[in-house]
């Protein structure tokens, strides 16, 4: 698979960096926008770091890559990519490895150009770009050698005078010493202002100050690269004179990296004498077993150091040696080791807010059975039910009975409550009564806790819309007019209207009028009312009576009809029921 996106971003970023003009702010803005995208295209989708031994899916068009060590782990993408779910299709990608190396070389090149100085001076994007440069720059590897420009990123930016200026001032000139006693070894300079260092620039440096008999050399060592040192005919013997074997339990000071108490651009500078004076307070304690992690920032382009052996010490020291116009001066910054006024933790601040309430305000009867004081946490949030408190010099306020009643008592009250139902009652009254019945507490109600109310779903209304279509149900809705069921061509079901004239049946057909076809009308009526008619006897027009034999379900009224010529409508109709 060809990582087209990462390749295109690398070409664009390289073109911008090579054509960078310090006087053009637009070019710096473009680099600031493009470089993070290039770094993101070379990120592992599992760990998020720069790719190491990258592998990529073979039969996929997505630009998702992972490290070889992260193969099989869950990716951080949401939603997940459907094209690269199967890790069996991932293979090593040589082009990605080349792009990662190109990214590192590009970052190394940036540290040696004026662009690095502009990145440090920029306030908005300094931290982000410096983090990218640290991630890609191989300055921390032992195989690479850094130049003076690269080291300027991690050392203090103070003017460095020449050797002639150092020796021109007699009061500040120190005693000379041979060049063979100078031993300066600095390894591992990184970019200043990175998030991992909080403004510091060296990964791990150590400065060791020995007893007076070995006070002629200083060894500054760490992991990284060697730095070129210049010959100087001055030493730090007067500075190291105040140190004695009684002050230090062993032969020196070990200074490592720390990353907390010093903010970027705000390092504290103290003289070496003040640092050594502060070390005298620690001379009575055993400092050989402590392993604290301070860091060192040193500019040793002009000035020798005394070589010492590195036993650990329990002080955090930040040393910066800058050459001044009047001589070599060693300055050090001591970060705060012990914070007297430390910040309170969240648990401590929360525990101070907890105040116990009197028992009498919580125990309201024998049913609760509480015998221990209950602590209530004070909060600013509004609660559903306020907690009853006892005023100063007063008595316990009464708590409403609804809060103290149990489930059974509430249910009993609801069951024994008089139920009034009237068909012509107002709907507003019915709704309030239904809601009151639906509210049933689920558990024993404790004071101070919100009551849980369970709402039941309203029962669906059965029957047709006749008389129920409006907000005010009425039995006179369909009287004298067509009902809504007739308009929808449906039969009425449990109709509450009086005089409803809907002629539709359940099967969707209309009823025939009784005077049209008597036999058909009776059959349709039987289907509508569900009557089993075994025999229907209708006498001729000449007969005086009509006898109808009906068997089936009891019917109070039955429709009987005769022909148009039959004028004996006032004669009796005999109906027999066989139950």
Curated annotation (Swiss-Prot):
> EC?
2.3.2.27
All copies of the CXC MSL2-type domain together span 459-510
Q: Name one GO cellular component term.
A: chromatin
| Pfam families xrefs | MSL2-CXC, zf-RING_10
Report keywords, A-Z. Answer: Chromatin regulator, Chromosome, DNA damage, Metal-binding, Nucleus, Transferase, Ubl conjugation pathway, Zinc, Zinc-finger
Q: Where are the zinc fingers (RING-type)?
A: 44-85
Where in or outside the cell it occurs: the entry states:
Nucleus; Chromosome
Q: Where is the composition biased (Polar residues)?
A: 441-452
- Catalytic activity, reaction form: S-ubiquitinyl-[E2 ubiquitin-conjugating enzyme]-L-cysteine + [acceptor protein]-L-lysine = [E2 ubiquitin-conjugating enzyme]-L-cysteine + N(6)-ubiquitinyl-[acceptor protein]-L-lysine
* Principal subcellular localisation of the protein: nucleus
Q: What GO molecular function annotations does the UniProt record carry, in alphabetical order?
A: histone H2B ubiquitin ligase activity; promoter-enhancer loop anchoring activity; ubiquitin protein ligase activity; zinc ion binding
Q: Which SUPFAM superfamilies match?
A: RING/U-box
The answer, when asked if Transferase is one of the entry's keywords, is: yes
Task: Quote the biased-composition stretches of kind Basic and acidic residues, using this chain's numbering.
Answer: 431-440
Name the residues that bind Zn(2+) 5. Answer: 478, 492, 497, 500
- Which residues are involved in binding Zn(2+) 4? 464, 485, 492, 495
The UniProt annotation puts the region (Disordered) at 161-181, 413-457
Which pathway, metabolic or otherwise, does it act in?
Protein modification; protein ubiquitination
Where along this sequence does the record place binding of Zn(2+) 3?
Answer: 464, 466, 478, 483
Alphabetical GO biological process terms: DNA damage response; epigenetic regulation of gene expression; positive regulation of DNA-templated transcription; protein monoubiquitination; protein ubiquitination
The answer to whether UniProt assigns keyword Amino-acid biosynthesis to this entry is no
Q: Which family does it belong to?
A: Belongs to the MSL2 family.
Its job: Non-catalytic component of the MSL histone acetyltransferase complex, a multiprotein complex that mediates the majority of histone H4 acetylation at 'Lys-16' (H4K16ac), an epigenetic mark that prevents chromatin compaction. The MSL complex is required for chromosome stability and genome integrity by maintaining homeostatic levels of H4K16ac. MSL2 plays a key role in gene dosage by ensuring biallelic expression of a subset of dosage-sensitive genes, including many haploinsufficient genes.
Oligomer and partners: Component of a multisubunit histone acetyltransferase complex (MSL).
This protein is called what?
Answer: E3 ubiquitin-protein ligase MSL2
Organism equals Gallus gallus
